[in-house]
Amino acid sequence: MIRKILICGFILVASSSLAKAQRDLDYDQVVVPQNRIDARDLGYAPVDVIPHGEDGITALTIAPNGNLYGATSGKRSHLFVLDPRHGYVQPLGYLPNTTAVTHAIVVSKDGDVYVGTSPGGHLLKYSPNLEDQQPLRVKEPCQVADLGPAVKGEGILALAIDREAGVIHGLSYPNAHFFSFTIATGLIKDFGVVAKHAPHGEKSETGKMVSRMLALDLKGNVYASGEDGFLYKFDKEKQVLTRLPMQLPGIPGREPWSRVDTFLTTPSGLIFGGTSDGYLFRFDPDARKVDNLGKPLLQYRITGLALGSNGKIYGVGGDKDDLARMFSYDPQNGTYEILGFIDVNRRPYYAWEAYVIGAMVAGPDGTMYIGENERISKLYLFYPW
């Protein structure tokens, strides 16, 4: 009798869980079309996955061979790879003495992966070697070489790479030093800061307001946002860091609290950016002109941008306490399309929706990879076609 009751109880619980996935069909009108999105666990569920609390995706990049590399933040940071031929996420191990990797992962022309860590601020080098033939590394450390700290006493906030020159550029935190690392020689050079002071009067923002990402133009110059919302340029030829006379778009008076959360350089040479206040802008490096393209979403923050094979720019954003939303922008006619919440609903098996997005990048075939940054996180795959 007791056994029957337990079985009945299990059935009721299972039925209840399935019922939660059985949403009203009208809900599908406000989410990303379900034939264009999918989700991946960070490993082989239910056992060989990056642990909860350590799996917030905060950095993504595409290697020259098309593989996706990503890093997480949390109690520990992990490195992972996704080979599009296989389609699954392979954990490569945790990064020693690291709790955060934020837009600080790049891949060299030779395929080596470089990671900027926080809080220690070390540069790590990972050299891939027949990864798909290696066992999953969830509880083991990632096999990396420690190249030492970039800026003494600072964490690394962002990295960008000039593959042809073999130079990695970075931004430190909390004191916003811009530095460069030459791969061939191992030489690190500090070029100064993009912010000297934190903004006054904002209780929620106590640190310096600097961009969370770096952008390279087609000439190899590097851009960041800094104090009072001004853009900064590192001139590759002159090897100097200067403040440009252009500020980020936003509400007048909020310039000190504005920063770039995401950058995207297009093949035309134009650079698009999304700000902490949720504005999309276009920057022409040659003309030194910033165009305010408005707010695609009512919410704050644009946390990811990627270029589609159809020429449209896709983005994600939203407040951390609300569901993340996806949009597209057509540079040809200047129109926006709100694509909906980032949600994967596979009735009746499971449903998963994202609140906070930590990174976004497009693969060579046009697939958009979107990293969730929560206590329990997934990697989303969006297909624009």
Walk through the language-model features, giving the residues of each.
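A short helix->beta-strand "capping" segment at the edge of beta-propeller domains
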Residues: 30-54
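Beta-strand-rich domains and repeat architectures in extracellular enzymes and scaffolds
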Residues: 47-77
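Surface loop/turn motifs at the tips and blade-to-blade linkers of beta-strand repeat domains
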Residues: 48-53, 93-97, 146-152, 192-196, ...
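Repeated scaffold domains used in trafficking and secretory/extracellular systems
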Residues: 55-59, 99-105, 153-160, 208-213, ...
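Residue-level detector of Asp-centered blade-edge/turn motifs that repeat once per structural unit
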Residues: 62-65, 107-110, 161-165, 216-219, ...
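Conserved beta-propeller blade signature
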Residues: 68-70, 112-115, 167-170, 221-224, ...
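Short loop/turn segments immediately following the C-termini of beta-strands
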Residues: 73-74, 118-119, 173, 227, ...
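Blade-level signature of beta-propeller repeat domains, shared across WD40, Kelch, NHL, RCC1
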Residues: 354-385
